[in-house]
Curated annotation (Swiss-Prot):
Protein localization: Cytoplasm
Similarity comment text for this entry: Belongs to the uracil-DNA glycosylase (UDG) superfamily. UNG family.
UniProt organism field: Campylobacter curvus (strain 525.92)
PANTHER family found in the cross-reference section: URACIL-DNA GLYCOSYLASE
Gene designation: ung
Keywords: Cytoplasm, DNA damage, DNA repair, Hydrolase
Protein name per Swiss-Prot or TrEMBL: Uracil-DNA glycosylase
Catalytic reactions of this protein: Hydrolyzes single-stranded DNA or mismatched double-stranded DNA and polynucleotides, releasing free uracil
GO annotation terms (biological process): base-excision repair, AP site formation via deaminated base removal
Length: 231
């Protein structure tokens, strides 16, 4: 099965950059598996939010990539942005720890919302390795082929762009390092921010390090303070 490019609802610069992926047979297989999954049960996020990260952060605006694993699998959580939940939804433990690190790193007080749209609009691509998941079943769509697609996203960004900061937290994210040209981009690694993860996330200072790198390469730093974002 081949996907009709006109049916792919994604921001135009990404549609052009990823055209070869959308027209490939594996992407058609992803679509078929999604159709079957939706017939069998609930899929997160809603269809209109699957490409939310791309729609909020056009290809040429990407400054930072924060790689997650797969969407949250509880009701009303997933919004197509890694680690992010809609305003009003309880902030997940991993994001609580991210906020704690930002406070320790930059002195920014922890916000009341888990919505990371403000970061996305500044050029932070909040990318999950898998873009969909079945309700209450973590990693249930990991065999759909999404990682072929998101690996291609990373490779294309690495090849076509310069001076992007890749924040890779946890071993699955660190496994993506070979996809990135480290001569022209900055890769920062740490343990996953989940309370269940082993290793050090706290003290990584990735947020100040990111901004230092961006500033050194004549790019506007990220305002990590979500308290400045009006929902």
């Amino acid at each position: 099965m081949q996907v009709n490019l006109e049916d792919v609802k994604i921001e135009p610069s990404w549609k052009e950059a990823l055209k070869g992926e959308f027209l490939s047979l594996y992407f058609g297989d992803i679509k078929e598996k999604l159709i079957c999954a939706k017939r069998a049960g609930i899929v997160y996020p809603p269809s209109n939010l699957i490409f939310n990260a791309f729609n909020l952060t056009p290809f040429d605006t990407v400054k930072v990539v924060i790689l997650g694993q797969d969407p949250y699998h509880g009701p009303n959580q997933a919004m197509g942005l890694s680690f992010s939940v809609p305003n009003g939804v309880r902030i997940p433990p991993s994001l609580v720890n991210i906020y704690k690190e930002i406070y320790d790193d930059l002195g920014i007080r922890e916000p009341n919302s888990g919505d990371l749209t403000y970061w996305a609009k500044q050029g932070v691509l909040l990318l999950n390795a898998s873009l969909t998941v079945g309700a209450n079943m973590a990693n249930s769509h990991s065999g759909f082929g999404w990682q072929i697609f998101t690996d291609a996203v990373i490779k294309i960004l690495s090849r076509e762009r310069e001076n992007i900061v890749f924040l890779l937290w946890g071993n699955p994210a660190k496994a993506k390092i070979p996809l990135i040209d480290t001569n022209k981009h900055l890769v920062l690694t740490a343990a996953h921010p989940s309370p269940l993860a082993r290793g050090a996330f706290f003290g990584c200072r990735h947020f100040s390090k990111t901004n230092f790198y961006l500033t050194q390469h004549a790019k506007t730093p990220i305002d990590w303070d979500l308290n400045n974002f009006q929902i």
